[in-house]
Amino acid sequence: MEKRTTNTPKSSQEPRERRTGAAGNRMKAITIILDEHRSLAAILHGMLYLVRSIRDGRATPDFTLFGAMVYYIDAFPERFHHPKEETYLFRLLRLRHPAAGPVLDQLHAEHQAGETKIRELELALKRYEHGGATCFDAFASAVESYAAFHWSHMRTEEDDILPLAREHLTDGDWDEIDDAFAGNSDPMLGAKAGDEYEALFRRIANLAPPPIGVGPER
């Protein structure tokens, strides 16, 4: 999947928090969170690339591919990644550092808004598939809106929340967070991938044309 750097959170550019020893073990959840952010960023970049290619007349719509991408966004970040952030990282940071409350409240509201936005994206895709070219602009707008929303959200987590977590959470807190996030099954993190999600990622990569995948050019 294509990974660009413009207006995206740091996780979608270069890995970080690659530490060794006790500190590395304690902070491995941050690496997982950043890896999962990169996974979502790659899917969003892919969708934006396809939308722009269609708009420029360089590609025709592949609704199977779009459907797989939207399903990934719904199935992994919205159902697994965000709930674990809320249940473990945000809860413990709020306990250890109450001053983070306003930013955590903002992120919680964005998690809830994300569920609405993914439904809007699904609906826009269905309308485009059944309504044809007249519905393309609305679908493209939904993709661009969702991507901008999520990049802003991830940037807040990485620039504001993760530094506070590193500063204020205890070793015991990190053990709890690490155990929770280590159980995630992200299709773009091969070693921990569950069969369903790994198969989904392979399907997306095989369907997507170059340079975002290995599928046929359109």
Language-model segments: which ranges?
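Small-residue-biased structural context
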Residues: 2-4, 10, 14-218
